[in-house]
UniProtKB/Swiss-Prot annotation:
One of its GO terms (molecular function) is phosphatidylserine decarboxylase activity. It is a peripheral membrane protein. It comes from the Bacteria. It catalyses: a 1,2-diacyl-sn-glycero-3-phospho-L-serine + H(+) = a 1,2-diacyl-sn-glycero-3-phosphoethanolamine + CO2. The record marks 246-247 as: Cleavage (non-hydrolytic). Binds 1 pyruvoyl group covalently per subunit. Heterodimer of a large membrane-associated beta subunit and a small pyruvoyl-containing alpha subunit. Keywords: Cell membrane, Decarboxylase, Lipid biosynthesis, Lipid metabolism, Lyase, Membrane, Phospholipid biosynthesis, Phospholipid metabolism, Pyruvate, Zymogen. One of its GO terms (cellular component) is plasma membrane. It is found in: Cell membrane. It holds the Pfam family PS_Dcarbxylase. This is Phosphatidylserine decarboxylase proenzyme. Its EC number is 4.1.1.65.
Length: 280
């Protein structure tokens, strides 16, 4: 085990994330301005794309971090059969779910059942596709719908808060199946679809457009919320959630319905709205 990986295990994840939350929501201008200036400078954040490009106009760091984009900054792929990329960021991995397993890095993998919280939830995705998108601190931090879907259920799976940066992904086995996460099940025109919002070190929260804040969740049991019959329908490319700091979203598709865009591969930089896959 490398020193970096050992430190990843040793860090007080919950304490650090709680502290990050307090700072992110602080309306003390000395705190918010210092954080905004530091992150903008260190990660070369492009505020020209923001609906509000003035960094001094944000009352808190969290407002800055979850900023909206100006109209037209991102557009959905023109092909109406394209599933679109759910976020800005970088492809961590993508491919076929083989023998129920999802590849993570360097020969490491985890099962779809571990990720989703049950064998039953994973069955529709056997031999299907997965795409893991990492959002760095410089990226736009709202997550959108790859395809039009009606929300059926969410599943909160408690867990750790390991970093999801490259060093941790390469060094911590089954990382995405161990971190706290929110699994969002949708019914679509081609069948079921899942978007998994993975929590991480320093992520102070995950919010959805239908329920508000979902993470942090202070229970230690898997929690399910049934949304059937509520008619929560989100269109392709519509916002569905946001991270209150950088993290990862994983999309699962059932077998035989789509093929990934050929230019995509591990480490590909991606933008919200570009083609993720095309329906067959």
């Amino acid at each position: 085990m490398s020193l970096t990986t050992a430190l990843t295990y040793a860090l007080p994840h919950r304490l650090l994330s709680s502290m990050a939350r307090s700072l992110a929501y602080s309306d003390d201008p000395r705190v918010s301005r210092w954080l905004i200036d530091t992150v903008t400078r260190k990660f070369n954040v492009n505020l020209d794309e923001a609906a509000n490009p003035d960094p001094r106009s944000y009352a808190t760091f969290n407002q800055f971090f979850t900023r909206a984009l100006k109209p037209g900054a991102r557009v959905a792929d023109a092909d109406p059969r394209s599933l679109v990329m759910p976020a800005d960021g970088r492809i961590s991995q993508l491919g076929k779910i083989e023998a129920g397993r999802i590849f993570q890095a360097k020969g490491q993998s985890f099962t779809a059942a571990e990720l989703l919280g049950s064998d039953e939830d994973a069955k529709p995705y056997n031999d299907g596709l997965y795409a893991t998108v990492y959002l760095s601190p410089r990226d736009y931090h709202r997550v959108h719908m790859p395809w039009t879907g009606t929300l059926r259920e969410t599943v909160h799976v408690p867990g750790r808060l390991f970093s999801v940066g490259p060093a941790a992904v390469n060094g911590v086995p089954r990382l995405f199946a161990r971190n706290e996460r929110l699994v969002c099940h949708f019914d679509t025109s081609f069948g079921p679809m899942v978007s998994v919002m993975v929590g991480a070190l320093l992520v102070s929260g995950v919010e959805t457009v239908w329920s508000g804040e979902e993470i942090p969740h202070y229970g230690d049991r898997i929690t399910r919320k049934d949304y059937r019959g509520q008619g929560i329908r989100l269109e392709r490319f519509a916002e569905m959630a946001r991270f209150n700091y950088g993290s990862t979203v994983i999309v699962l598709l059932p077998p035989g319905v789509a093929d990934f865009a050929p230019q995509l591969g591990a480490e590909s930089p991606v933008q919200l709205g570009q083609a993720l896959a095309k329906l067959r």
